[in-house]
């Protein structure tokens, strides 16, 4: 961390609900956690100053304000926006991490711009080729991490192994699992299943000798059954799965609402089952894990949903603080270093095996 006090730069501009909702979320996070941490609120001073005063945020001495005059909108092209809006709240927040003023950046803004800005400005860790976006997914018996859900749609097989390290460390922090069991998403659980990317990655996982607690392939049919703590996939597949899941939940809610409104008997039934619905909400960690970290960078970048409300912003701040306090970045670097040592050892063993084979062939000849 930049110092002994964890510091988060929060970009309060560019979200669907506007800066006020995010500022209220910051206030809720400060109210629920009285420990020693800092929040730098980044945004257009003319817009955010009245809101900070209205909601008594500046009375907390853990809050600082950083002025940024521009906003990257949701529909802007990421690279073009980065070049033309150099004083955007998002890029200024990332820069605060780059120079060491903050340890993490949290934003609800343009996902592409956040990923591009984070990757270009902060760079990937040594040994990590591409960052990956990880998120907590609710399961039938327990929650699990899915990674990657959108950062790298067409990765190399080696990157999927890297993603397992990133996801396992996030599972340790977010879910409290000491030795997360990792599965590789495929179209079946048999060793012969999967495309060339999955097949090659599957072989690499088997050869990594214990750095990752690898359990094998998992298919979509068993995704939510709790067999694995981390599910690894490419960013294209992960994004499709995530959006399909969100769409399915929304469809279920809409259909349920329509059916309830058909009869007063159904409405009465909902009142009777109110306790069950409250318990269902507790099992779905929408607010608690609303921030998805972009893992593998030299600095923590956390993406919250564009329509995140105040509770979800407070939850995203909470999980970001947990990542910082648990020294997740350092743990990732250590595991990546261990993995690379094993990879080099395996290569050397293979070269030695080939050399001996060649010598035996020459002797026989």
Q: What residue spans do the PLM features occupy?
A:
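N-terminal phosphate-binding or glycine-rich loops at protein starts, especially the Walker A/P-loop
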Residues: 1-49
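Phosphate/nucleotide-donor binding subsite
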Residues: 57-102
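A glycine- and small-aliphatic-rich helix-loop capping segment at beta-alpha/alpha-beta transitions
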Residues: 25-29, 57, 113, 117-134, ...
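Short beta-strand segments
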Residues: 11, 41-43, 66, 107-109, ...
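Glycine-rich phosphate/nucleotide-binding loop
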Residues: 119-146, 227-231, 235-345, 352-353
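Glycine-rich phosphate/diphosphate-binding loop of Rossmann-like nucleotide-binding domains
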Residues: 17-21, 33-40, 49, 58, ...
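Short glycine/serine/threonine-rich phosphate/pyrophosphate-binding segments
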Residues: 18-22, 48, 86-100, 104-118, ...
């Amino acid at each position: 961390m930049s110092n002994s006090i964890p510091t988060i730069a929060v970009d309060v501009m560019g979200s669907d609900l506007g800066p006020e909702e995010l500022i209220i979320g910051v206030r809720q996070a400060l109210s629920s956690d009285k420990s020693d941490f800092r929040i730098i609120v980044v945004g257009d001073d003319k817009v955010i100053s009245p809101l900070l005063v209205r909601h008594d945020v500046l009375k907390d001495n853990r809050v600082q304000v950083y002025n940024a005059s521009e906003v990257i909108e949701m529909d802007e092209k990421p690279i073009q926006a980065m070049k033309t809006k150099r004083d955007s709240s998002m890029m200024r927040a990332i820069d605060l991490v780059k120079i060491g003023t903050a340890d993490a950046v949290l934003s609800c803004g343009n996902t592409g711009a956040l990923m591009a800005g984070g990757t270009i400005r902060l760079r990937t860790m040594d040994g990590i080729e591409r960052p990956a976006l990880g998120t907590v997914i609710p399961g039938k018996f327990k929650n699990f991490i899915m990674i990657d859900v959108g950062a790298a749609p067409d990765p190399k097989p080696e990157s999927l192994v890297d993603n397992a390290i990133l996801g396992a460390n996030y599972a340790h922090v977010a879910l409290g699992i000491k030795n997360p069991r990792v599965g590789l998403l495929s179209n079946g659980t048999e060793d012969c299943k999967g495309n060339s990317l999955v097949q090659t990655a599957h072989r690499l996982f088997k050869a990594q000798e214990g750095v990752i607690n690898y359990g094998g392939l998992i298919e979509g049919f068993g995704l939510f059954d709790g067999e694995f703590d981390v599910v690894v996939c490419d960013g294209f597949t992960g994004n499709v799965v995530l959006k399909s899941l969100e769409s399915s939940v929304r469809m279920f809610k809409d259909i349920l609402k329509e059916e309830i409104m058909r009869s007063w008997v159904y409405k009465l039934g909902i009142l009777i089952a109110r306790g069950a619905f409250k318990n269902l909400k507790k099992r779905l960690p929408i607010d608690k894990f609303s921030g998805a970290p972009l893992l593998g960078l030299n600095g923590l970048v956390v993406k919250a949903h564009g329509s995140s409300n105040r509770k979800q912003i407070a939850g995203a701040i909470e999980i970001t603080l947990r990542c910082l306090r648990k020294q997740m970045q350092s743990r990732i670097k250590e595991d990546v270093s261990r993995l690379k040592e094993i990879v080099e050892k395996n290569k050397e063993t293979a070269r030695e095996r080939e050399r001996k084979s060649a010598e035996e062939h020459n002797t026989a000849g």
